[in-house]
C-alpha cells in the first residue's frame, strides 16, 4: 500500500481549509484517509503561527514507514526541519522555444544591419567633407 502525506480540502466555497492527512494513493483527495496529522489555512497571513500546524512526531513516524509527501506538504515539512526536499532545477524549461529563438535571431540580425548602416552613413559624410574642403583651398591659392 503506497502512502502519501497530502492535503485534503475542506471549508466552504472560496474559503479553503486543508487537513494534512496520511492517505493511500488510490483514495480520493478528500476521501478516506488513515490519519490526520495537521491543518493548513491558506487564508491566514504567512507569518501567522496558526497557518500551518503539523504533528511533527507523527510526520516523522509516517516518513520512516515510507509515506511520501506531496510537493506542498514537503515544503511544510522542510520548513519544520523534518524532511529535506530535493532542489528542483530545470534550466531547459526557462529557455525560449524554437519560434521565440527565431524571432530573437531575426531581431538581432536587424539590429546588426541597422548598426552597420548607421556606421556607414556616419563615415560617408566624414569622407566627403575633407574632399569638399580641398577644392576650396585650391581656389584660394
Curated annotation (Swiss-Prot):
Basic and acidic residues bias locations: 89-111
Coiled-coil residue windows: none
GO CC annotation terms, alphabetical: cytoplasm; small ribosomal subunit
GO biological process: translation
PROSITE patterns, per the entry: RIBOSOMAL_S16
Keywords: Ribonucleoprotein, Ribosomal protein
InterPro entries tied to this protein: Ribosomal_bS16, Ribosomal_bS16_CS, Ribosomal_bS16_dom_sf
Comp. bias intervals (Low complexity): 115-141
Any one GO molecular function term: structural constituent of ribosome
Region (Disordered) residue spans: 84-141
Family, per entry: Belongs to the bacterial ribosomal protein bS16 family.
HAMAP family: Ribosomal_bS16
Protein name: Small ribosomal subunit protein bS16
Organism, as annotated: Parvibaculum lavamentivorans (strain DS-1 / DSM 13023 / NCIMB 13966)
Lineage: Bacteria, Pseudomonadati, Pseudomonadota, Alphaproteobacteria, Hyphomicrobiales
Gene that encodes it: rpsP
Amino acid at each position: 500500500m503506497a502512502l502519501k502525506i497530502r492535503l485534503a480540502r475542506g471549508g466552504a466555497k472560496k474559503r479553503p481549509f486543508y487537513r494534512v492527512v496520511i492517505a493511500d494513493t488510490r483514495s480520493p483527495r478528500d476521501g478516506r484517509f488513515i490519519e490526520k496529522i495537521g491543518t493548513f489555512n491558506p487564508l491566514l497571513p504567512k507569518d501567522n503561527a496558526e497557518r500551518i500546524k503539523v504533528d511533527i512526531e507523527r510526520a516523522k513516524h509516517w516518513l520512516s514507514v515510507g509515506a511520501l509527501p506531496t510537493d506542498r506538504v514537503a515544503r511544510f515539512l522542510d520548513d519544520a526541519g523534518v524532511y529535506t526536499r530535493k532542489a528542483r532545477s530545470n534550466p531547459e524549461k526557462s529557455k525560449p522555444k524554437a519560434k521565440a529563438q527565431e524571432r530573437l535571431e531575426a531581431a538581432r540580425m536587424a539590429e546588426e544591419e541597422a548598426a552597420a548602416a548607421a556606421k556607414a552613413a556616419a563615415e560617408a559624410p566624414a569622407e566627403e567633407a575633407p574632399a569638399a574642403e580641398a577644392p576650396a583651398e585650391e581656389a584660394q591659392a
